[in-house]
Amino acid sequence: MAAAVRQDLAQLMNSSGSHKDLAGKYRQILEKAIQLSGAEQLEALKAFVESMVNENVSLVISRQLLTDFCTHLPNLPDSTAKEIYHFTLEKIQPRVISFEEQVASIRQHLASIYEKEEDWRNAAQVLVGIPLETGQKQYNVDYKLETYLKIARLYLEDDDPVQAEAYINRASLLQNESTNEQLQIHYKVCYARVLDYRRKFIEAAQRYNELSYKTIVHESERLEALKHALHCTILASAGQQRSRMLATLFKDERCQQLAAYGILEKMYLDRIIRGNQLQEFAAMLMPHQKATTADGSSILDRAVIEHNLLSASKLYNNITFEELGALLEIPAAKAEKIASQMITEGRMNGFIDQIDGIVHFETREALPTWDKQIQSLCFQVNNLLEKISQTAPEWTAQAMEAQMAQ
């Protein structure tokens, strides 16, 4: 039967007639090829592709028929469709400028097959082949944005955050031009994930936290975004930005539902965290968040050591390297190195006396400390009032009226 299809195509190529008539006849041959199965179907479809890219066939007809051809292929078995897609791309390559729209469609379908097979890298590379910026065809903003986001997401799945960042940066140039709210959300999610994978944890936390307030996002996904914001904040380097983010999350009542709330509370209240208190939280982390740093410690260990060092700076005026190492559960030399780095980077106030082997912490002013304590007290009182008003709204209304009347 494949031979019959090939013969019909050869006869039609040498015949004359209007574009409409010829297109109709080619369409009949395509339908016949689709009806076949197995190796016969494969050979017949390959013959059809070879005929369509032949320069003797009018470009008007071949474009139209290749578009029809692309609509049929997703209905075929993935193994057959994949082989046909690769064959078609190879045959079209010499005339790719003439078939940009069809090539883009083929690449989108082929990428979907690779994605189903969880072959993330090949799926991404197939989409990269679409000439979104350099081709003659003008693609609309939403199509380009969606494709760049898909490529970035696929590279993330393949644990390649460097390539993912390159394509999310391209998407960044387009996202302000798009009015598609769903695409805007996809962009924010993808960008947050890229920052997370690139270990830019505080920036990722800010993005995730922003997503957790978007009403267009389902409630369960908002809570998931909040969880990621909390995890990234805990993993971030100690400093003012992280302290602000800890305060933001601690004041968000939704965080009380999260498993990591206990760690958040300890960090916000500047309490020392012991290694045995981290096991449960460490199990919640994603694989890339469990990576080790240059000194051999995990990202979580490093973040907690820095947090504990900041907490110690609020408990002591000064401390020896030996005592600091014992407090942080690390060697004295490592404690000195981390303290030195934090002071140098302006993330902790103090200075090091290497002759006596002592870290001196600068004394905080009393007023800002009182301000923080008063702020915390007011926050707790507000929480109590809200809970009372939810439990007894009528009594609350009467009490407020009585207060106003005085």
From Swiss-Prot:
- Cellular component annotations (GO), alphabetically ordered: COP9 signalosome; synaptic vesicle
User: Domain PCI: where?
Assistant: 197-366
Q: Which GO terms describe its biological process?
A: protein deneddylation
List of residues that carry N6-acetyllysine: 25
Matching entries from Pfam families are given as: CSN4_RPN5_eIF3a (PF18420), PCI (PF01399), PSMD12-CSN4_N (PF22241)
At which residues is N-acetylalanine found?
2
**Which keywords describe this protein according to UniProt?**
Acetylation, Cytoplasm, Cytoplasmic vesicle, Nucleus, Signalosome, Synapse
Q: Record's superkingdom?
A: Eukaryota
Q: By its UniProt entry, which Gene3D superfamilies does this protein fall under? A: Winged helix-like DNA-binding domain superfamily/Winged helix DNA-binding domain (1.10.10.10)
Q: Where found in the cell?
A: Cytoplasm; Nucleus; Cytoplasmic vesicle, Secretory vesicle, Synaptic vesicle
Q: According to its UniProt record, which protein family does this protein belong to? A: Belongs to the CSN4 family.
Q: How does it assemble?
A: Component of the CSN complex, composed of COPS1/GPS1, COPS2, COPS3, COPS4, COPS5, COPS6, COPS7 (COPS7A or COPS7B), COPS8 and COPS9. In the complex, it probably interacts directly with COPS1, COPS2, COPS3, COPS5, COPS6, COPS7 (COPS7A or COPS7B) and COPS8. Interacts with TOR1A; the interaction is direct and associates TOR1A and SNAPIN with the CSN complex. Interacts with STON2; controls STON2 neddylation levels. Interacts with ERCC6.
> What does the UniProt function comment say about this protein?
Component of the COP9 signalosome complex (CSN), a complex involved in various cellular and developmental processes. The CSN complex is an essential regulator of the ubiquitin (Ubl) conjugation pathway by mediating the deneddylation of the cullin subunits of SCF-type E3 ligase complexes, leading to decrease the Ubl ligase activity of SCF-type complexes such as SCF, CSA or DDB2. Also involved in the deneddylation of non-cullin subunits such as STON2.
Q: What is this protein called?
A: COP9 signalosome complex subunit 4
Name the lineage: Eukaryota, Metazoa, Chordata, Craniata, Vertebrata
In the UniProt record, what gene is named as encoding this protein? Answer: COPS4
